[in-house]
């Protein structure tokens, strides 16, 4: 007997946004319905909100096209941000010295489930 799949997942890897800032936005949508989550993200004035919205729309598209789930009844069951690789750069400073700059990246994952 085959089990009915009720969830779909989407991941964006090595996204050029800080995990700490992305977590603030992802906490807003966890547990919400997809329609609510999209409206929250549209009106959140944050760079990572646009990226998270794309990942959410990708998860919804995966649910619809790959698993034939009903889009109206989808809920954001899991949403988390992990730390990606850090790009290390140097900023020139006075007297020939340099300061390190860490350009952080994130791995963003969103899982949607049918109610």
Curated annotation (Swiss-Prot):
Q: Which key words tag this protein in UniProt?
A: Ribonucleoprotein, Ribosomal protein, RNA-binding, rRNA-binding
The molecular function GO annotations come to:
rRNA binding; structural constituent of ribosome
Biological-process GO terms, alphabetical: translation
Kindly list the GO CC terms recorded for this protein: cytosolic large ribosomal subunit
What superkingdom heads the lineage?
Answer: Bacteria
Q: Which InterPro entries match?
A: Ribosomal_uL22, Ribosomal_uL22_bac/chlpt-type, Ribosomal_uL22_bac/org-type, Ribosomal_uL22_CS, Ribosomal_uL22_sf
Q: Which Pfam families match?
A: Ribosomal_L22
Subunit text: Part of the 50S ribosomal subunit.
Q: What function does this protein fulfil? A: This protein binds specifically to 23S rRNA; its binding is stimulated by other ribosomal proteins, e.g. L4, L17, and L20. It is important during the early stages of 50S assembly. It makes multiple contacts with different domains of the 23S rRNA in the assembled 50S subunit and ribosome. The globular domain of the protein is located near the polypeptide exit tunnel on the outside of the subunit, while an extended beta-hairpin is found that lines the wall of the exit tunnel in the center of the 70S ribosome.
Q: Which family does it belong to?
A: Belongs to the universal ribosomal protein uL22 family.
Designated name of the protein = Large ribosomal subunit protein uL22
What does the record give as the organism's lineage? Bacteria, Bacillati, Bacillota, Bacilli, Lactobacillales
């Amino acid at each position: 007997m085959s089990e009915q799949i009720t969830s779909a997942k989407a991941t964006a890897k090595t996204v050029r946004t800080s995990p700490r800032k992305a977590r603030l936005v992802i906490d807003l949508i966890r547990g919400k319905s997809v329609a609510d989550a999209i409206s929250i993200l549209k009106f959140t004035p944050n760079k990572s909100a646009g990226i998270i919205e794309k990942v959410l729309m990708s998860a919804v598209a995966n649910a619809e096209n790959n698993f034939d789930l009903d889009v109206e009844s989808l809920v954001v069951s899991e949403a988390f941000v992990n730390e990606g690789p850090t790009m290390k750069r140097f900023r020139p400073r006075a007297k020939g010295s340099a300061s390190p700059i860490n350009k952080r990246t994130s791995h963003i994952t969103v899982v949607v489930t049918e109610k």
